[in-house]
Structure formats: structure tokens, C-alpha cells
């Protein structure tokens, strides 16, 4: 099984006015990876998690991305899915300085080793951005 499952084929459309979506988020990774083997799981992944949940405008995408990064970090999930969600957070307006503060804050609740692993991924994602 590829560790890229759940971290590809998400089309986060153009944003306007900060984090306001102009089009829906579309996900196909579930169907692409597991459509024939686990069609119900693929449906929940693509249509419910990324379709309904990520398109719910009650929480803006920047906040939703921060929540997702912290949730994955707190579970110790430091594979490509966490890196992907760190990139999404960056794309939704989370600066390097904010990401460092978020990971540092979460470290006290989720654990220091998990923060180290998350910082390593965040450094890769933010490596081309000048420090703010």
C-alpha cells in the first residue's frame, strides 16, 4: 500500500477573500486507490470527508487545515498525508511563523517527539519561503 493514499488528487480550487472557496473541493484518491477493493470506504473518503466536510463553510479553510495538521500530529501520523496537509495549510495562508507556533503549542499536548517529526515535514514544505 502506498503511503501517498489520501494525499493526492485533491483539487483545492481558487480561493478569494482569504479562505472563501469559489468552487468545491474534489477528491478522487479513495476511488483511485481503493475503488474496486473497498468502494464504501472510497465513497466516504472522497464524497464525505473531502466532499461534504472540507466544503462545509462553517470553518474557513485555514482553520480547518490547522485543525487537520494538529489532529494528524497528535496521532503520530507523520507520513505523506501530514506533509500534504501542512502544504494545504501553507496554501490556505498559514505562514511559516504561524506553523512553527502551532506545532510548538501542540507539542505540549501531543508530545515532543511528534512535534520533532512534524517540524521535519514542515521545514520541507516551507523551505523555499523566506522566514517572516
Regions found by a protein language model. Give the residues of each.
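Acidic, glycine/proline-rich low-complexity segments that act as flexible tails and inter-domain linkers
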Residues: 1-63, 91, 115-132
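Amphipathic alpha-helical core segments of compact helical bundles
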Residues: 50, 72-75, 104, 108
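A cross-kingdom feature marking solvent-exposed beta-strand/loop segments within repeated
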Residues: 82-104, 120, 125
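Short, solvent-exposed interaction modules
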Residues: 75-76, 91
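Short, structured motif recognition centered on aromatic/hydrophobic residues
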Residues: 64-72, 102-103
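C-terminal structural segments of small proteins and small subunits
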Residues: 106-118
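Short acidic alpha-helix initiation/capping motifs at coil-to-helix transition points
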Residues: 43-46, 76-82
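Short runs of predominantly hydrophobic/aromatic residues within well-ordered alpha helices
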Residues: 63-66, 96-99, 115
Amino acid at each position: 500500500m502506498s503511503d501517498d493514499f489520501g494525499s493526492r488528487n485533491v483539487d483545492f480550487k481558487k480561493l478569494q477573500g482569504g479562505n472563501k472557496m469559489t468552487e468545491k473541493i474534489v477528491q478522487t484518491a479513495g476511488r483511485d486507490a481503493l475503488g474496486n477493493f473497498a468502494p464504501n470506504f472510497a465513497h466516504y473518503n472522497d464524497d464525505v470527508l473531502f466532499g461534504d466536510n472540507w466544503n462545509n463553510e462553517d470553518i474557513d479553510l485555514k482553520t480547518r487545515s490547522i485543525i487537520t495538521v494538529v489532529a494528524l500530529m497528535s496521532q503520530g501520523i507523520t507520513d505523506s498525508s501530514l506533509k500534504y496537509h501542512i502544504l494545504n495549510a501553507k496554501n490556505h495562508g498559514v505562514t511559516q511563523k504561524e506553523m512553527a507556533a502551532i506545532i510548538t503549542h501542540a507539542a505540549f499536548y501531543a508530545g515532543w517527539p511528534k512535534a520533532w517529526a512534524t517540524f521535519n515535514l514542515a521545514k520541507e514544505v516551507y523551505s523555499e519561503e523566506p522566514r517572516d
